[in-house]
Amino acid sequence: MQVKETVTDGLKREFQVTLAVSDIGSQVDARLDELKDKVRLNGFRPGKVPLSHLKRTYGRSVTAEVLEKLIRETNDNIFTERGFRLATEPKITMPTEAKEVEDVLAGNADLNYTVAVEVVPEIQLVDFKTISVEKPVVEVGDSDVDDAIKRIVEANRGYDDKGEGATAASGDRVTVSFKGSIDGTPFDGGSAEGIPVVIGSGTFIPGFEDQLIGIAVGETRTIKATFPTNYATAELAGKAAEFETTATLVEAPKDTPADDEFAKTLGLESLDKLKEAARGRLAAEYAGVSRQRVKRALLDRLDEAHQFEAPATLVEQEFEALWRSIVGEMTSTGSTFESENTTEDAAKEEYRKIADRRVRLGLVLSEIGEKNKIQVTDDEVSRAVMERARQMPGREKEVWEFYRKTPEAVAQLRAPIFEDKVVDFILELATVTEKPVSKEELYKDDDADKSAA
């Protein structure tokens, strides 16, 4: 066997490999010798088939099998001896000329092929003890709890029929049936019956609810409203529509005091217990947002400390996935690059930077996990699957079966668990300073942290 490195370009490597005909032949003979006790050929007793006859009958297929094994083992040796960590699957280029291929399969010539790969660069990890991050901390105030209780009351308040002839006011709940059209033509999803609408809740498209003020039971109105430009259904985004709307019930909100009796309707002993639960839920919510802030800050520090060339193929794959997502979202919302105050070229440049960052951070986190033996346990994966199953009541068995049969989906569950475990490991060594902030400061620019890696 001969190996010659022919390309060294950044992280790209290519090798010219020659497998000697003698090495190929000896392995073919060994494989045929294994087969002679297993094959059954007319005219020969078991185990007595001459090697020459076996070679005439099975030589080409066995040679192909041996070559596949030799190429795989040779490539593995090339990469292992050089300490390569592969970023991509090896790309193998075999002979294409018919005579050369025939000579190799006939056992009359060496096999010459090339193998090209892209490798992961050697990563020098920063000393995690030199990393400092701030942890924003929000104290749950009494006013926060009071606001939460108000929201709970609003979400659980009852309504009373206002009676015959009464008209709807802001805050009332009106049950309506409507038929929507655009330019006189009905559209999919534009008609419904028996839909409760709380005037002022903002759950319907802008302008719809306000035009219900003053409506009475049995009254029909033509409500004109325009779908937002970022509406989820692209075909409707920005379109002006008319809804022939009939009210079938008008109800006023009940006066629902936040007291012990109200708390009991929610299964709690008292208002104090409800406040305690609300405080705990807010504390958990703030802690979750704070965690994302800390994680983002830590990833920023890791990004700054590990500036290296990322494998171009991985960056391109990440960019393509990102770009498909962006284009799909823009299509569904009807937005354009112009409406987002950018251009396609500028957006692509920005998302290529994001893709490069994600790939580098992924490699860094993987390196940290490997060097510190951080692993995701089967129990952790099972808990993640259980959580997914709980989110789909009635389809739990289907969810379990899906993950049992889909290794790629399990890998997608493992990835964020692994990332969080590595982050926790680093934070144990880094300097984390708590910084008291307001609720508004905690949530400021929250969208920027949703793609932390």
Curated annotation (Swiss-Prot):
A GO term, aspect molecular function: ribosome binding
Chief location category: cytoplasm
Top EC class of this enzyme: isomerase
Alphabetically ordered keywords of this record: Cell cycle, Cell division, Chaperone, Cytoplasm, Isomerase, Rotamase
Residues making up the signal peptide according to the UniProt record: none
E.C. number(s) listed in UniProt: 5.2.1.8
GO biological process, one term: 'de novo' cotranslational protein folding
Pfam families recorded: FKBP_C, Trigger_C, Trigger_N
Keyword field contains Magnesium: no
Designated name of the protein: Trigger factor
Organism: Rhodopseudomonas palustris (strain BisA53)
